[in-house]
Structure formats: structure tokens, C-alpha cells
Design a protein with these regions (language model features):
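Catalytic toxin/effector domains delivered as secreted proteins or via bacterial secretion systems
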Residues: 1-113
Length: 113
């Protein structure tokens, strides 16, 4: 609910300007690492708001900002490959933190399209 309230307050709700991005993609919900540590795919900690093409233009966001829309197959593959080698919950938390920073501020650190 907090995410919706934030979008409403900022004038973003149902305007097609932003979309919620699952940091660990939903396709990995049954991955052994995700299941082993009981990672909640729908928790707010697994979501980041990313602009759409329309949002990037209207909100006048910085150049290089990741755009959410369509598929991001390279990202999903990358996340799956890293999940394959994670052995501790601490590693999983560190990886999700790394992905959040990559999605928001350092897109050069993660593959996208």
C-alpha cells in the first residue's frame, strides 16, 4: 500500500510513467536458492520503481537511466546464473542490494536488454 500511496502523492499512479520491477524476477520464484532462504518475491524489498519510455521523457530523468518495459531477458538470465552460485542468505541479500543499486544508479553494472 505504501508504494501505491507514494505513486498517488507524486502523481505517478496509473499514468504509465513508472512500473514496478522485480529485482529477483518472478520467473525465479521456484529457484532452489530463492526457496531455500524463503525469499519473498512480492515483498517491497524485491521491487524498485523504474520509469517507462513515457516516464523518462515526461519526468526528464537523467541520461542512461534504465527503462522498464517489455522483456529484459539478459537481466533475467544474469540473475539466474548468480542465483546458481549463491550459498548463503547473506550473499543473496548482498546480491539483491547490488541489483537495486544497478537498476537505480549504475546500469552499466548489470545487463539489461
Amino acid at each position: 500500500m505504501a508504494r501505491k500511496a507514494f505513486k498517488v502523492r507524486r502523481g505517478l499512479y496509473k499514468k504509465g510513467l513508472v512500473e514496478d520491477h522485480h529485482v529477483i524476477p518472478r520467473q525465479h520464484a521456484t529457484h532452489p536458492t530463492v526457496k531455500r532462504f524463503g525469499y519473498d518475491m512480492n515483498a517491497s524489498s524485491n521491487l524498485v520503481m523504474l520509469p517507462t519510455d513515457k516516464g523518462k521523457e515526461i519526468l526528464r530523468l537523467r541520461e542512461g537511466r534504465l527503462i522498464h518495459g517489455g522483456k529484459h531477458a539478459r537481466y533475467n538470465r544474469y540473475v539466474g546464473n548468480i542465483l546458481n552460485v549463491i550459498t548463503t542468505e547473506e550473499e543473496l541479500c548482498a546480491f539483491t542490494d547490488f541489483l537495486k543499486v544497478g537498476c537505480r544508479y549504475r546500469p552499466q553494472d548489470i545487463p539489461w536488454h
